[in-house]
Design a protein with these regions (language model features):
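Alpha-helical scaffold segments
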Residues: 1-171
Length: 171
């Protein structure tokens, strides 16, 4: 390697570290946009993530890395919603604290397998009841379904309804 190549390599390494460690703001990113390592920056939880920053640098950001970023700012519906077409939903689904209302709003985008598998038992039951059309498409076997409390409630309700109907025909 030449001296210039070594200097360039070291400079890239410094910017990679700066990109992953500093609490960047939109103002700083505007000033240093050409030096920043955008992949590293996209996974940096210390960045002051705002809708304005995401809009301004949407074409530079690594959205796959950003989707795995656990920054609380990136879990906000106000940040997620406008960029629905950019997120990698398998990762975003895993790395966001979902409320029932926001699940309902973003149901078409969510990775239901990830959402369901990472959910608490209570949330799984809620998803099964409220979003059956999505959950029912997951690759479950018969035993998976039978272990669900909702399955038992459904069987009990249907049994009672049908038993009443059948017995109403007996004279």
């Amino acid at each position: 390697m030449t001296k210039d190549q070594i200097c360039a390599l070291r400079e890239r390494a410094v910017w990679k570290k700066l990109s992953s460690e500093l609490s960047w703001t939109e103002e700083l990113l505007t000033k240093y946009a050409d030096q920043v390592d955008w992949k590293e920056l996209s996974s940096n939880e210390k960045v002051l993530w705002t809708e304005s920053l995401l809009r301004k640098f949407a074409d530079k950001l690594d959205w796959e890395e950003l989707s795995t970023n656990r920054s609380l700012a990136l879990q906000s519906p106000d940040i997620i919603r406008p960029f629905a077409l950019y997120w990698h939903w398998d990762d975003k689904t895993k790395n966001t604290a979902w409320t029932p209302k926001f699940v309902a709003e973003m149901k078409e985008h969510l990775d239901w397998k990830e959402l369901y598998q990472s959910a608490s038992y209570e949330d799984q039951e809620f998803y099964l009841k409220e979003f059956f059309e999505y959950v029912s498409q997951l690759p479950f076997n018969e035993n998976s379904w039978r272990r669900s409390r909702y399955f038992d409630e459904y069987v009990d309700a249907q049994w009672k309804e049908r038993a009443t109907e059948i017995l109403s025909h007996v004279k």
